[in-house]
Amino acid sequence: MSEPADLQLRTTELLQRLIRFDTVNPPGNEQAAQEYLRDLLDGAGFEVELLSSVEGRPNLIARLAAESDGPALCLLGHVDTVLANAAEWDVDPWSGELRDGQVWGRGALDMKSQVAAEVAAAVALAEAGWRPQSGELKIVVTADEEAGAVHGAKWLCEQHPDKVRADIVVNEGAGEVFEYDGRRIYGVCVAEKGVFRFTLTTEGRAGHASIPRIGDNALTKLAPVLAALASTRVVLEPSPEPEAFLEAIGVDATDLGKALAEVEAVNPAIAVLLEPMMGVTLAPTMVSASEKINVIPSRARLKVDCRVPPGLGEEHALERIREAVGENGYEVEFDETVVGNRSPIDTPLMGSIRAFVEREDPGAQVTPLVLPGFSDSRWFREVFPDCVAYGFFPQKAMDLFEAAPLIHGANERVPVEDLGLAARFYSDLVQETLG
């Protein structure tokens, strides 16, 4: 497949430019970055428009269509980022500095790197005269992903479905290589867990804190709940993605408990990442009680981040909560409920990814993953049920365990070698899918 010789350089320079746009969300302020991308794509022959639900926070949609019908391939990304504390960094987080073969800055991994690779690949192809033989290529770059996508992908899919409708979506979520028992493996995010955050409330009786027994302390009633949550392990539940993951690393998935124990014995770090894919997780994160230090609280609240396997809902979450902490002495109220979703594993897109990995890293394998959180892919799956949406940004120079702590962390950076790798993948995929 044809690829410009300077694709890695073009991607690197574009990423540096994107990092220099401060798009920390909130407030986001994605306008300037999106206008820069618009001009690049427009100059290469794409039909481009910016759509906003609020002023200053546009989403970009770029199209390059064939005259004949065919699949719609969407390369998806977002340009907003989380905050960076400059005092914790070795470089200016918005400098896009190139140091030791890596581009540094907020968004270098999440996910201006992927946006740069997708756009650079698309622009290079278009400038070289490539056009789809059938179907269409869409580049969709969203705002507001880091704050729930209310002004981004969610809004686009719900309010402008005809403009972003796609058969195939490639987004963020996986792609870094990792090793297990001598195998090199690249993950592909094919599903995302649901979010069922809840508040657990205990009741007591207020009183003056100088006489502790005069009241009934609601806060201390949370102690056994916290202890129970601390000791709770994930109830392992059969589902296609973790079973395929186990198969890829050569572990028998017949007994999930034995399988997880085997992985933990061989590589504990992999087990830590695998376990959340296999069932409901419950993580207590916030506590509130009395508003005054000298008042025994009559009510105490514990907030718990609950993540549920794709396709399962509130009833299933509540069942696992009751199993973990019992049923008496408290109330549970769900504050946020989002059902996770998935795409099929065996698809032409997965075949394209496997073929690319074999070309670039002979002998390496590919495995599906479940993203413990969620990304913009979930909105596309929800609104377009037949859409196949995967997360894949291939990284060979920086492995999973080096990359993971840098995402949303200090000194976020990405090797230029991986920028070139990813851009080649998107270029190859576009030509293979659309002709």
Pin down the residues of each PLM region.
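Short, solvent-exposed loop/turn segments at the edges of secondary structure
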Residues: 57, 91, 134, 164-165, ...
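Acidic/His- and Gly-rich active-site-bordering loop/insert found
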Residues: 2-108, 115, 125-135, 304
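A short core secondary-structure module
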Residues: 154-156, 209-236
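Short amphipathic alpha-helices in soluble, non-transmembrane regions
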Residues: 75, 317-325
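Flexible glycine/proline-enriched surface loops and loop-helix/loop-strand junctions
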Residues: 182-184, 203-210
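Acidic/histidine-rich catalytic neighborhood of metal-dependent amide-processing enzymes
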Residues: 103, 109-188
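An extended, acidic, His-containing surface patch that forms the Zn2+-binding/catalytic region
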Residues: 46, 68-70, 177-179, 234-294, ...
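Short Gly/Pro-enriched turn/cap motifs at secondary-structure boundaries
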Residues: 35, 50-52, 145, 177, ...
